[in-house]
A protein has these predicted regions:
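Short, low-complexity N-terminal intrinsically disordered segments enriched in polar/charged residues
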Residues: 1-34, 132-134
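A short gly/proline-enriched turn/hairpin at secondary-structure junctions
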Residues: 31, 35-47, 58-62
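Secondary-structure boundary/capping motif
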Residues: 47-48, 93
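A beta-strand edge to alpha-helix "cap/lid" segment located at domain peripheries
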Residues: 2-8, 39, 53-134
Length: 134
């Protein structure tokens, strides 16, 4: 049964990845419970689909050709760890970026993300946007 759960979660994560690549922030938010939350790098949580749509749109606006790939998906201590890589061109500077990070999901009874805590190296992203080599 655990294998079936991971198969279902991997399918869910694959569709979530495609939603990010589809440049439709509202579609990304549909993977969250109506009162779900997304917290990025310990910041203020985006709570509810409208707020999550706005958060996703921020990335999509900053990187109009954004592509996300799923690097790994594991279950650990009751959480689902979704590891990803984002590649894209920063809209204002024209600089290409590539960052990796992860989200720690708590999946609700409805099969949607109830809570997501995301993390990536924001300083590295800023260096790439500014064009610094180190």
């Amino acid at each position: 049964m655990a294998q079936d759960r991971m198969t279902q979660l991997r399918d869910f994560a694959t569709r979530y990845t495609a939603a990010w690549c589809g440049q439709d922030a509202g579609n990304v938010s549909k993977f969250f419970a109506p009162s779900g939350s997304l917290t990025i790098n310990g910041g203020t949580p985006s709570v509810g689909r409208s707020a999550i749509t706005q958060a996703a749109q921020g990335f999509m606006t900053a990187f109009p050709d954004l592509k996300v790939s799923m690097d790994d998906l594991v279950e650990k201590q009751g959480k689902i760890l979704y590891h990803w890589t984002l590649e894209g061109t920063h809209g204002e500077t024209g600089r290409r970026v590539r960052i990796s990070g992860f989200e720690s999901w708590r999946i609700g009874e409805d099969g949607l993300i109830a809570e997501s805590f995301g993390n990536f190296d924001a300083a590295d992203l800023e260096r790439q946007i500014k064009g610094a080599d180190s």
